[in-house]
Amino acid sequence: MNIFYDANKIYEAGTKAIKSAPFKYQSQLFEVNHLLLTAELQRDIKEWKYKPTKGSKFTINERGKIRNITTNDMIDKTVNHLICDNVLTPAITPYLIYDNGASQKNKGVSFHRKRLEVHLHQYYRKHKSNEGYILLIDFSKY
């Protein structure tokens, strides 16, 4: 069965979309109508009628910096989760290095701390010294 037609997968994706911001009005409204919206989305996908919306655009002033925000509709977020969780993630995961934990399940902060410790021990065994460098990179405003 095509995952895009599977109501259970669509419902799961909608639940994940709600979890991103359960306190927001849009999420709460979606949750109240979750089953109905799942059925409607399933029908629209089957009949090739689904079209992403433009979303909402607004500006906020955060700590003195003006930010232009674009947000997607909950239905679009559901479709994004459906595609990412069931198609893209399984397709690219086999090609990622083990140490890449960016946004991957079960690869949080503790995973990276343990991996850092493993690499430090490997470095010490190889060079018999603690003298060396660690390069830390943080991408911002990209």
Regions found by a protein language model. Give the residues of each.
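Non-catalytic, polymerase-adjacent accessory regions of viral genome-replication enzymes
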Residues: M1-R43
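Short, compositionally biased low-complexity segments
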Residues: F4-A21, T53-K57, C84-I92, Y124
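Non-catalytic, well-ordered alpha-helical scaffold segments
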Residues: N8, L35, A39, D76-H81, ...
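Short, charged/polar micro-motifs that form catalytic or ligand-binding hotspots
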Residues: S27-E31, N68-D73, K77, A102, ...
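Reverse-transcriptase-like RNA-dependent polymerase core
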Residues: L41-K65, L120-H121
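Conserved pre-motif C helix in the palm subdomain of viral-like polymerases
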Residues: K65-I97
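Active-site-proximal segment of RNA-dependent polymerases
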Residues: C84-Y142
